[in-house]
Amino acid sequence: MGYQHNRSFNKATGAGFIIAMGIVYGDIGTSPLYTMESIVQGQGGLERISETSIIGALSLIIWTLTLITTVKYVWIALKADNNHEGGVFSLFTLVRKYAKWLIIPAMIGGAALLSDGALTPAVTVTSAIEGLRSIPAFHEAFGQQQLPIVIITLAILAILFLIQRFGTSIVGKVFGPVMFIWFSFLGITGLINLFGDFSVLQAINPYWAIHLLLSPENKAGIFVLGSVFLATTGAEALYSDLGHVGRGNIHVSWPFVKVCIILSYCGQAAWLLQNRGKSLGDINPFFAVLPQSLIIFSVVLATLAAIIASQALISGSFTLVSEAIRLKLLPRLKINYPGETFGQLYIPAVNLGLWLAASFIVVYFQSSAHMEAAYGLAITVTMLMTTILLTVYLAQHQKVKKVFVVLFFGAFIFIEGLFFAASAVKFLHGGYVVVILAALILFVMAIWHKSDQLFYKYLKSSNLNDYKEQMNKLRKDESYDLYHTNVVYLTAKMDKEWIDRSILYSILDKRPKKAEVYWFVKVNVTDEPYTSEYEVDMLGTDFIVCVNLYLGFHMRQEIPRYLRTIVTNLMESGRLPQQHQPYSIIPGRKVGDFRFILLEEKLINARQMPAFERFVLQTKEQIKKITASPARWFGLHFSEVTVETVPLVLSDVRNLEIHERISKENEVENLSK
């Protein structure tokens, strides 16, 4: 992960081709499992669907994959990489300097994409397991009962989410080959069934797509687009996974994937033309086109593909949340790094949330047909938000004519707007579940972003230069015991010599902390994903060190590891005196002990604040109670840490007036004096 050079990033290799199969195309590659089924049901079933509807629906699928996936994402969006990283948050970091309001589409798009992460595993695994009904022995035993399907699906999801904590590097090695077999299977079976009726190839003509939308034979009307959109739901994931495989591998592998997917849809359409008008009950064209001898193999392969698609989405959700945390759009959560692969991470809270949400969706909706009614709504929102951000990027970063930018924005806002309108009807048929989930995530993002702004608004700063003399006297004062050799404060606000006043309150007022060196460290998250740099300002002393760490939004914020390097560099350059330790298991140790002090600002005198600001800050305090501690987030769990609570000093809060009550005896006594 993390291509370091443009040459390797744009280069395509055989290994990269196979890896892309497993990482990038899982979601879009499992769409043939349920897209045609949803379209057939929307047209009244197999016995009522018309030839125009079949050809038109196939045409809509082909051109949706072409315009949205190929043109927008593969040709255009992949060029909008942030140091080889893609996705809605990476795109946001490229354009946020141009307008503050761009945070809004970024948050909406991110929240919608995360909510979709709960629905995709549920619908893909359920669709695959429902293929068991095509096996005679299974059908004879359970018939159309949905309970066995639900139980098997829940078991697979449980195993899938439970193994996340162990890392997926070993399993990931087989993802690519399995998905290559899956796409080959789609292409071959689709081609074989295509021989049954080559007339479906006329769907390549976009006339049939437009004709269906306007045709009275289309029983679903414009809402047929809600089912058609299922064919391209994985396009956004394709962009998000850019950093995992590189642009070159996606450019080379997508034509193969697209051909195989379209052949599968063509084969299903040909079978539908041959069997339309028949009363076969609720059937899934994907499994119906296969001979009985291949059913068991296809169910197993489809289940593996569904698991891989789910795994890719789960891993993508971990990455998305970690980016949002570092961009200060979500609270800090515990992040583990279970694998040896760079960038592989595991977030227990997100994993548990996705597992519970996916399991609830399976139990609540029962069948994939009902889940499909809710599927796609969130992704249309994410795609619209990506279009807005991408338009700003094209206007500012690319040497393209303004007319192209206008055409791009107009065309895709119109196309995706139609899909959104068609999918909006899903709200009443289950889409509200995803909308509620997305709204909750967006609420937390909005609270976190706004509270961060308010924090800087109310936090007071002081100039370190005004307190250097006091700090120097304190470190030499024999009446105080040495608190620690090095005292380190992590601060969210430091501009040159100006720092958070609460830190000086902690050093000088709360309990004078005598130390040889005072460290003030601020972590600055850069727009580049893999930055690892620092700046040091010692304010003309050898006992005050102001450190600005510049870390990319993909980098771990493990302060002690970076600090060890900085201390060594400062001592080797002579800027910091060596701290010889007489007692140590390390011979000749030159670095003393460290104590990290974390300050927790608590809101005081909240009644003096505007009601909305008070609500935001108080809500943040409640959310922080269930999130990861700063000590764990900054990699301090093996260090000596002190957590102090200090008041959030508000600039507009006045002291409360109070008058002394004087008794008559005291009043007479005072008068006599």
From Swiss-Prot:
This protein's name: Putative potassium transport system protein Kup 1
Gene Ontology CC annotations of this record: plasma membrane
Keyword set includes Chaperone: no
Keywords, sorted A to Z: Cell membrane, Ion transport, Membrane, Potassium, Potassium transport, Symport, Transmembrane, Transmembrane helix, Transport
Taxonomic superkingdom: Bacteria
Cysteine disulfide links: none
GO molecular function: potassium ion transmembrane transporter activity; symporter activity
Membrane spanning residue stretches: 14-34, 58-78, 101-121, 147-167, 175-195, 196-216, 220-240, 252-272, 294-314, 345-365, 374-394, 403-423, 427-447
Recorded topology in the membrane: Multi-pass membrane protein
Stored InterPro entries: K+_transporter, K_trans_C, K_trans_N, Kup
Keyword Transmembrane set for record: yes
